[in-house]
């Protein structure tokens, strides 16, 4: 079988498509023929930063894939022919995240799924929603589950609440779709008017171009009558966090997810304390959360937004497109 491998720290163009032996599942494991992968920004920076991260070579990239079970080990309830989707963390079945969970991320700490056949623990996959194709299901493990986690904990968004979504990346697009089925209003920021129009078509209540309106937090306050939003899906990091704190209401929630504006910066904790804001770090989610999300997807017949589908042998192009940041929705690799 064939698998893409990170074999050096030389970036996307150094990825190698190599031959590997077809893996055999041990007890408690399943072998999955991958029909599709989707890529995340995290996958791109893992490849680009493989040397600095001291990644073992070779490493198969990607956390998100969907396909069909082709073999099972002893003690497994799944059957050959079952459709399944990978879980980002192999060992986060339920409950709180811990150090052992963090060490079980696919496509980084553990081998990823950009291969024709992969072996995963049975608890590291989840049945694919029947309403989705494998290409659509492959978009769920990271971006969709991150958005779901940010909107459901420490408590679920309530119908009628207002949620601020920063940017129009994969997490924010899924968050918009989930807010629509939850009955929540949204305010969306982006530097692209075209992408804002697309978010409006998905149900966004208000849109703000932060390039032409750099003090976008003041506009959010104006749109909410001065009270602020109930929740923020914060993907920017240090460059946007203080404005997010200003834009959220007293007693509101900020789901802190990304660092798209960088990894360094200073934050004044006083407004967080003064407004009794809950700031929750969000790093994808558990298999139990995934199951809850899939039920919502099935019930509402939600369809992930896919921008482009690339052939398996042209996987490098998918990462270059991710780096270009012109896409709206997910980038998928079809085996």
Please annotate each region the language model reported.
Residues 172-173:
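N-terminal Rossmann-fold NAD(P) dinucleotide-binding loop
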Residues 162-168, 180-243:
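Adenosine-nucleotide cofactor-binding segment
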Residues 88-166:
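NAD(P)H dinucleotide-binding glycine-rich loop of Rossmann-like/cofactor-binding domains
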Residues 101-103, 182, 193, 199-200, ...:
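Glycine-rich phosphate-binding loop and adjacent beta-alpha segment
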Residues 23-37, 50-94, 109-112, 129-131:
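Glycine-rich beta-strand-centered segment in the early N-terminal region that forms part
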Residues 1-65, 120, 211, 320-323, ...:
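Short N-terminal strand-loop motif that marks the start
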